[in-house]
Amino acid sequence: STSQPLNLSTSVFDISSPYISRLARIDGVARLTEKERLFKIAIEDNKSLGHSPGQFIMLSIPGYGEAPISISSTPSKKNTFEICVRAVGNLTNALHRLTKGDRLWMRGPYGKAFPIENLKGKDLLFVAGGIGLVPMRSLIKTILNERIAYGKIHLLYGVKAPDEILFKDELTEWGQHGISIQITIDKPHPEWKGNTGVVTTLLPPLKIDETRTVAIVIGPPIMYKYVIMSLGDKRIAGHNIYLSLERRMKCGLGKCGHCQINSVYVCQEGPVFRLSDIRYLREAI
């Protein structure tokens, strides 16, 4: 008997399964800094990614492996989304060598997102360090699409040097839409006229209403402890502080254990956590 061609619509293979990779192509590349590039990715099956702010994908390039990458764009019904990637390893350096039209594989989205509904009607305090602004951008742009639903918004952003500031044009645009933005660099620089010092130096003079403020914190692991202490000084309660934890994720499915903190799998129960839920988890912060 002759074998019949595989019909994916009736196949035992579920193409919506989180285990199944989807073919995608690079639709555009923009150089943001010496280390970071913004990639517009188009999914070949023409279906939307279906993500929420705070989620991530697993991106793979054959021969170079797979890595978790934060989604930097707002949710959309289109088949395109954006990621901002720093060239730091095998896969990310390979990605930086790709150009428009090149293909890659992705699966996801994965992880717990930011609870948008819990933020509505609140004042928001964003604290970003370095490339922490990348996943934060997805949330900020989503909020700006419905700016009237939120109160005062502050963004405190810390980087090592002026040439590491991401999304410079967008930061200006966000400021024009009612976000108070303060940027600081770690050490003095001849071309920098703004604040100098780590991002926590921006918190003490900030005037906020602790009863209606929700803080969102994303940055390198070393930053969290000090930011949380400063937010405590501002009397912001732990249940009003959300963190996106950077942990080494490998499978994205809660199977491999690389991102495990005690009994918590960051890729499944995070990467977004409420501080009050993880404050007592050893090694979490």
PLM region spans:
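Local cysteine-cluster metal-coordination motifs and their immediate loop/turn environment
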Residues: 222, 246-271
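Short microdomains enriched in Cys/His and/or Lys/Arg
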Residues: 127, 273-285
